[in-house]
Amino acid sequence: MITLKTIKKKYNIEQKNTKLSIGIDFGTTYSLVASALEDNIYIILDQNNRALLPSIINYTSKKPIVGWEAQKQAINDPKNTIISIKRLIGHSYDEINKLYPNLPYHLTYDKNGILSFIVQDNLINTINVSSEIFKTLKNRVNTIFNQKILGAVITVPAHFNDLQRQEIKKSAELANLNIIRLLNEPTSAAIAYGLHLNKNKIVAIYDLGGGTFDISILKLNQGIFEVLATSGNTNLGGDDFDQLLVNYIQKKTHFSYSKLDFIFQRKLLYLAKSIKIKLTSHNSVQFQFNNSKMHTITRFEFEKMIEPLILKTLNICQHVLHDSNTNLTHIEEIILVGGSTNIPIVQRKVSDFFKQLPLCTINPEQVVVAGAAIQANMLTNGSKYNNFILLDVVPLSLGIEVIGNIVEKIILKNTPLPISKTKTFTTFKDKQTTMLIHVLQGEHKLVNKCQSLCRFVLKEIPKKPAGKIIVLVNFQIDVNGLLSVTAEIKSTKIRKNITVNASIPIKKYRN
């Protein structure tokens, strides 16, 4: 079994030719950083012995305040204190308003079409906001080690789409980090556990965090980590449990959330968060809000409240078992990941579903960053952790729009990475000289039910009758799950390339 250690003091790397690499778990609620060095995995602490960094950024001062100090401002300055940024990245303004209608922020777009916040009369996009978390974690590392960070592995939800992955990558690069791999969170947890799971086996990784849910089925076979299938929901997590508690408190105290100002809304949210945490270890909790009378909520009430959301995750688990061509009898280990798996009913329901007790010998809040640190060390140094091969998969199908508002799939979900695939298309009208390539991600057949990633135009098509000109469309996805698209006129070799990235305006093309 791997051993996790913590470190907060200056550390000199003694092994010769050892390059410093780090793993970062960029979370909805908290973020962490770790490094695998000299046969140990170190969770890097701040000066106050804290491993967790709240993923919160406050913009009241000239310089952004990040983490615990920002959390102190979250209630009294909600408009300028951004929480759960991970849930907002890669989304359009309309999507955010639909998903989270009561946010206190003043949202707009920057000149590149990226969702942005107006704070203290400044325009700050989601990439810049996220980068402050990476900068803070990087500074934490720099205060400990005597070497430059040569590479970082950053974990992302397995079900993140291409725009979200690109935005995280750009945020980390803005913090001057060299990104050597984007690693899916469940796969990262499997790496942390898999190093001591010597037998060949099939494992399930159930990852329920603050903002997202992932489930992955992996086959471990003589040092090969093969992801058989993955699925999830990027808008389901502990934050949703908080919102259910907010609704409960409103009913008990007769306060209408929508009629409260933003400060009281944030106070109510943080009261809900504290109740949730206390109910993890207590059978009941007393509370009051804004001088209301004292009320009591029991764990039983809370569990009934959140049970439908937990059942949603188990329904996704059922689908991923089907996608992986496995059944419950094949699953030999179920691994819990994410802070929300500390909730007793989550553990019980997962155990009942998989018909076995979950494995949680590594702290669920630290296992992902541990795996990322191991992967980073392997990619930069080799070391004792170089005896495994990682085979991940495409989380969502990718294709292009064709006539009839239909998506023609080019790469299907759960295809092993990396992958390059080409499909043939033809012109659909006489003397057609251009072709619009609209790239989409998702499982639905209809365009408006899928995620629009980008559009570009292939020009200089020879004027021929409909169907006579052949266009080859190639999709290439690298090990990070990042997409490049090429469209080529077969007869003339004229081509157009594009790498889908977060700087492509999304406000115009979201469906």
Swiss-Prot record:
Gene3D superfamilies from the UniProt entry:
3.30.30.30, 3.30.420.40, Actin, Chain A, domain 4 (3.90.640.10), Substrate Binding Domain Of DNAk, Chain A, domain 1 (2.60.34.10)
| A Pfam family that the UniProt record links to this protein | HSP70
* Entry's Gene Ontology molecular function annotations: ATP binding; ATP-dependent protein folding chaperone
Give start-end ranges for the coiled-coil region(s).
Answer: none
Listed PROSITE patterns: HSP70_2, HSP70_3
Tell me which UniProt keywords the record has, alphabetically. ATP-binding, Chaperone, Nucleotide-binding
Q: Which InterPro entries match?
A: ATPase_NBD, Heat_shock_70_CS, HSP70_peptide-bd_sf, Hsp_70_fam
Domain of life, per lineage: Bacteria
Q: What does this protein do?
A: Chaperone involved in the maturation of iron-sulfur cluster-containing proteins. Has a low intrinsic ATPase activity which is markedly stimulated by HscB. Involved in the maturation of IscU.
Homology family: Belongs to the heat shock protein 70 family.
**Could you identify this protein by its name?**
Chaperone protein HscA
Give the source species: Buchnera aphidicola subsp. Baizongia pistaciae (strain Bp)
